Amino acid sequence: MEEHFVNPVQKAGPTGGKKSREPGILKAADGIDWNEAWKMQRSQKAVIKRDVNFWDNKARDFFKKPWDSNYSDDFLKIMEPKRCWTVLDMGCGSGALAIPLAKYVRRITAVDFSPGMLELLEEQCKTKEIDNIAVIKASWEDNWTSKGIGSYDAVVASRCLVVDDLRKAIMKLHNAARERVYISTIVGDGPHDRGMYEAVGRRLTPGPDYIYTYNLLYQMGICAHLSFIKDYRQESFQDLDAAHQYYDRFLGELTNSEKVKLRCYLEDQLVARNGKWVLKYKRATRWAVMWWEKE
């Protein structure tokens, strides 16, 4: 886990750091409108947009990811949660963050637009005997008040800022928080394997990364702390067919020609190890974590 602060005088942690003022209105003198820049980059990205049907159909496959991850542990170290906190986990998925966070806070409201993901989260809560997580089915675009989303000590949006209007999403998070807001998003290519895209003849344009978010926060008058998480991954599978099926879904709507190219690439890059098929190379996915305090 790496950490970086734009202003070295500010100290990160529960007792340090300059609090943000209330987000202001953009002025012409501010130069680049980073929300519009975000929208433009979003419109040019080549990565497929995954809707609710995608996540419902693939929930269990994505829950059983073919690699171990240090992301949640590192995020919690940055977050430094308090036992008395109520937390909103927006875009919670199957509970990658909510499940480990539950033992450190008073109550979590976990929100996602995928019923399949929420079902997996509730199953885990039952299995692990976790009784302080409540779920709400809602999206970024919904009226949060009408969905029962209120105010919370801390608000989290972890790896889920897949929105067209970033400023509006940030304002929703900010307004729902009493003390702090935490968001995380991709750095560079994020979780996307550039070599995999090139192997099937596709150009990887993952869309806007963290710098758009950070610059927009600054433009809105929010002086956010900035840290980085490096999440190492080396995917492993039971067999070649399982690997091919996984990446076929991840890349999205492959043609027959692309499927042949993908299979050839995997045959070349997968090696047998301890009864599984493992990619020869290990990748480091970097995530940017930004957080700020309410005044």
What are these regions (language model features)?
Residues H4-K82, C84-G93:
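Conserved class I S-adenosyl-L-methionine
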Residues A96-D142:
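Class I SAM-dependent methyltransferase SAM/SAH-binding core
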Residues Y152-R167:
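A short SAM/SAH-binding and catalytic strip from SAM-dependent methyltransferases
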Residues R167-Y182:
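A short glycine-rich, Lys/Arg-flanked "PGG" loop and its adjoining helix->strand segment in the class I
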Residues I186-L204:
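Short, glycine-/aromatic-enriched active-site segment of Class I SAM-dependent methyltransferases
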Residues P206-G221:
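Short alpha-helix
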Residues H225-E295:
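Conserved Class I S-adenosyl-L-methionine
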